[in-house]
Structures are given as structure tokens and as C-alpha cells.
Amino acid sequence: MALLGKAAVAMWWSVRPEQRSEFGDWHSHEHFPERMSIPGFRRGSRWTSTTDAEGFFVLYELEHYDVLTSKGYLDRLNAPTPWSTKMMPHHLGMIRSQCRIVASFGGGVATSLATIRLSPEAGRETALQARLSEVLDALARQPGLSGAHLLLTDTPRMSAPTTEQQIRGKDGAADWIVLLSGYDADVVERAVIAQLASSVLHAAGAQNRMTVGRYRLAFTMTPQDVAAI
């Protein structure tokens, strides 16, 4: 998939099995429509982990970086609905990264996704970003793959945690994020093992600590979908 806009919110968390049914109902029928009604939100997608029975990944694609500090978004973060207030404590181990999209290749929405969380070695940021852009551009063109992207976390300065953050507890954040999507899960996996392996990225300038997640698409929504409801 090609990411829509210039910024994103990327989130990883877990939900216990006994909460997953209500979580899916709330997230699909209330929370996503609410978020897609905020000016500047272009698309939301929810992904279910294929390796962790409790894991989720959610991506919000935003028109531009300033949406992260817009009144429309902050008003929602500080006034959660009763259902959101009930569900937020069940977001366990939240990693929430507010990002700039620095490279995005491909098109469409596919069913398989790999996420790689990494950090650059000090002084090698420029070289690593350039190398990743080359690799991701090439990967997005390969049969079985559909999109390849690089996001850099750039957390806006906020005076205080939002109400939603206070309900959840302290969120973590990733640093650099690679997203690789495809319509063939085996091809996505082979690319992660070969072109995006820890040893390959370390040689290009990444630190040797990376976290890889593997997901399948569960739900996606755009503002146009909300308008049609």
C-alpha cells in the first residue's frame, strides 16, 4: 500500500483473549469512525499478529504532521467516549509512535504486513535512511509485495498527557519504523529474512536491536467510508 499523507500514528499493543470480541466491536464500529471523522485523518488500518495471539498493530495515516497537534485530534484524545474509557485500560504494553513519513513506495492495500522497529547508530542516520529508501523502493516493485515505507518518530511537544494516555498508563514509543506489505505472506517473510534481516540493516547503519512483527489485515477505514455510513 502507498501511505496517504505525510505523517502517521503507529501503535502496537496486546488485548487479552476475553476482551478481544468487545475490542473488535468497539474499535471497528465506534473508534475508527470517530478517528476518521477528524480533519486530516486519511486512513486507518488494524492488523492482527500472526505470531502473538494477543498482539495488534494499528496505523493511522495523516494528511500532514500538524494534524498530530490539531484541535480536532486533541479534543478527541481528551474527551474519550464512555466505551473508549472502558476499553482503554485493556490496551496492554502500548507502543505509540507519532511519525513523519520519510519514504513510501507502492500502492493499494494488501493483506500481509511486517513491521520492523529499529534505531540508527549514532552518526549513521543519513546513510541508513538513504540505504533503506533504496531497498524499500526496490522491494515495493517485487511480485507478492505491495508497499514499503519508512517512518521516523517525531513526538510533538505536549504540555501534559492526554486523557486517553492517563487512562492507559505510560505509553512507549518506537524510533524508526519499516513497514513492508504484500498480498503473499510468504514473499513478505522472505524479504524480511533476506533484504531486511538484522545483520543486513546493522551493516547499513542500524543498531543491532530490532523488533519484527508479522500481521494480517483485520479492518481498514477511510473518511469516505464514514461518510457512507
At which residue positions do the language-model features occur?
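Macromolecular interaction modules
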Residues: 1-229
